[in-house]
């Protein structure tokens, strides 16, 4: 029955992947709808909507799903979501910021607090950790668009503030480029970069840590579990942290 068992395992993994993909599309749709409701339903006139659509495209979200999310907003349909932010500490003293879109603050707050409490962390008050981060715009490209020098040159020309490149080591880790810009310049810089690097995988507001906290083997697994639990919550859009897990520790985690 080994073959049958293997088939079941494959189907289980596929089911889990499909579920995760569906949840991701749901979050992307929510952001598109909120962005369209807050501004014009035309992405050329609404930078936040344009960024949300780009993020959806980067995750291969079907065009019909994107169109439905915009249409829902333009007709005033769907739930009204509120932007909320939670701050706290994870295992090893790692500072964590959680951004969510919710139609029920009490539900989301309870879920986030429980996630922290059950995974070695604790939820703090508003402003508890954000002072250790800088609010910036973030433009993301895959490593394949060019080497560090090419991307750095394009970023400087476009008006970016900083570039962090990881060129990867093969198909499983193709690398990426993170281009940091001032919040007010985000979409202007993104448009300039499109001329030389093409359309970005992600254009969004982000929290960049001023300093990073190194995480040891004792805390790394619990920290990653906390982040997974938070990201799996339907209301949570993004989780930011100031952690740095060394490569040798990541290897021991498999």
UniProtKB/Swiss-Prot annotation:
Any one GO cellular component localisation term in the record: cytosol
GO biological process, one term: regulation of DNA-templated transcription
Name by which UniProt lists this protein: Probable transcriptional regulatory protein Saro_0419
Family (UniProt): Belongs to the TACO1 family.
Listed Basic residues bias regions: 1-14
Listed transmembrane segments: none
Record keyword Aminoacyl-tRNA synthetase present: no
Xref: InterPro entries: Integrase-like_N (IPR017856), TACO1_YebC-like_2nd/3rd_dom (IPR048300), TACO1_YebC_N (IPR049083), Transcrip_reg_TACO1-like (IPR002876), Transcrip_reg_TACO1-like_dom3 (IPR026564), YebC-like (IPR029072)
Protein's UniProt keywords contain Nuclease: no
Compartments where located: Cytoplasm
Region span, Disordered: 1-22
GO molecular function: DNA binding
UniProtKB keywords: Cytoplasm, DNA-binding, Transcription, Transcription regulation
